[in-house]
Regions:
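RNase H-like nuclease fold core
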Residues: 1-52, 56, 60-67, 71, ...
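RNase H catalytic domain
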Residues: 13-20, 59-140, 144, 149
Length: 153
């Protein structure tokens, strides 16, 4: 039996944050460490923030995965907010009625809730990568997200 895994590299871009934004996700499926399928996804928004684009990239990438997928899925992002939210802060936010420790509401609650929902039943690992540091997969989605943001009229 082949060992299957899925990687999702994501990035968001925002010109004049807040402002025009773009997102990108590269979804790759591997069988025994050989890439067997790849999908590049991207989109844009006329008025948004970099955090919303980072989250949208992950949401759209995960949205390509079937709900009954058994493979290990690793999401790579250079967004410390996204990785920290998904690996550390979410349980407290949910327990505190979507409020931060400061008492202020969690921003982008709609996207956090959508990310929780899309991950349900999946084996998802969240991994931070340093942006603009020579990681070829991160550079790929960074360029696509920037191009998508630049296309917004």
């Amino acid at each position: 039996m082949k060992h299957t895994k899925i990687t999702i590299h994501t990035d968001g871009s925002c010109l004049n944050n807040p402002g025009r934004g773009g997102w990108a996700a590269a979804v790759r499926r591997y069988a025994d460490d050989e890439e067997v399928k790849k999908a590049l996804l991207s989109g844009h928004a006329p008025a948004t923030t970099n955090n919303r684009m980072e989250m949208t990239a992950a949401l759209r990438g995960l949205g390509k995965i079937k709900r009954n997928e058994q493979a290990q899925i690793t999401v790579y992002s250079d967004s410390q907010l996204l990785i920290g939210g998904m690996t550390e802060w979410l349980p407290n936010w949910q327990r505190n009625a979507w409020r931060k420790s400061s008492g202020k509401p969690v921003e982008n609650r709609d996207l956090w809730e959508a990310l929780v929902a899309v991950c349900e039943g999946l084996d998802v690992k969240w991994t931070w990568v340093r942006g603009h540091n020579g990681d070829a997969r991160n550079e790929e989605v960074d360029a696509i997200a920037f191009a998508a943001a630049s296309k917004v009229a």
